[in-house]
Amino acid sequence: MNKRAISATIIDTANELFHKKGYLATEVDDIVNAANISIQEFEETYSSKENVCKQVLKSYSKDLKAEFKKYEENDNTRQRLSLFLDKYFEDAENIAQNGCPVFNLYYDLCNMNNELSELIGEILEMQHKWFDEQFIIMLKTESAVDQGDRLMSAISGLILLAKLTGDAQMFKSQIIQLRSWIRSM
């Protein structure tokens, strides 16, 4: 494998392990073994688990920006928010079993007070800001930001509850309720 392919394999593998085991419980050896590469290949590509995590976070950020850009092709802000919620609805089984990869990393990294905690915070803040922007456009008032707060809180709580209970059906039902709430505005 060339260096680019090894890097992609490491990032994909680390992403999956961080999601399922958590960042703190994942060791470099876990990544190496699951990626089916040598420790030397890992060390020639990344200097540490932290650097791998930075790349995972940069990937999340890039993907989220691309999703927002795609949603913004739709002129209807209610539809944009519904499309965003569809992503969670479609991933309900995985969320109920393993949680949300971004929120899981947030819980692991938020108290570290380092670049990783800043990066994960920026990703969630970007999502929150996008929600706020959609509600401001939809309701034509700056005071609509509290609706963005409400949506962010609801999603966060639902992800936590789904992982706690393992109940994908409950999660889906609540996502449907959130979509109905948005449509009613």
Model region roles, listed by residue range:
Residues 9, 13, 17-51, 55:
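Helix-turn-helix
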Residues 91, 111, 152-170, 181-185:
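Amphipathic C-terminal alpha-helical segment
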Residues 113-139, 149, 180:
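Amphipathic alpha-helical packing segments from all-alpha helical-bundle domains
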